[in-house]
């Protein structure tokens, strides 16, 4: 089981290498609408919320990774996201299949993360 320090170390390594990390996503009918992601800019991790189309158009050469936490928290790791073209859309998956539905693991909704951020800013 990875602890917070090792997750942060893995994240730093990926971000400094110019990869992107997805930490939340809004999904409707098996299709991602928007994601919360982190990237490296000017010596620090930067968070942004973008649409799926924005991510498709700006897919980094170093890849995109999903923060995966198994039920109960036994496994915490980053899994590389594969992007492929389906009949009607581009799809993102971490399981190696080409099923025409997005699957980034058990990420929370973006709205949940926005709420957490808003609560943390209360004064």
Segments (PLM) and residue ranges:
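Polar low-complexity intrinsically disordered regions
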Residues: 1-5, 9-10, 104, 120-123
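Short, surface-exposed binding/anchoring microloops in extracellular/periplasmic proteins
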Residues: 2-42, 48
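Acidic, aromatic-enriched beta-alpha/helix-loop junctions
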Residues: 36-86
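Intrinsically disordered, low-complexity segments enriched in small/polar residues
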Residues: 17, 22, 28, 41, ...
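Short, compact, well-ordered microdomains
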Residues: 73-123
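Low-complexity, compositionally biased segments
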Residues: 29, 51, 56-57, 61, ...
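Generic N-terminal initiation segments characterized by hydrophobic and/or small/turn-forming residues
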Residues: 12, 34, 52, 101-104, ...
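Proline-rich intrinsically disordered, low-complexity coils
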Residues: 2, 60, 71, 108-109
């Amino acid at each position: 089981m990875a602890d917070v320090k090792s997750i942060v170390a893995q994240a730093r390594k990926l971000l400094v290498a110019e990869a992107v990390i997805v930490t939340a996503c809004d999904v409707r009918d098996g299709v991602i609408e928007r994601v919360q992601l982190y990237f490296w800019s000017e010596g620090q991790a930067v968070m942004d919320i973008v649409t799926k189309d924005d991510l498709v158009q700006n897919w980094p050469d170093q890849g995109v990774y999903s923060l995966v936490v198994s039920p109960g928290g036994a496994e915490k790791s980053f899994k590389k996201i594969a992007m492929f073209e389906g009949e009607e859309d581009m799809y993102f998956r971490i399981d190696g299949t080409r099923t025409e539905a997005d699957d980034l693991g058990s990420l929370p909704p973006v709205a949940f993360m926005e709420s957490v951020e808003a609560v943390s800013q209360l004064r």
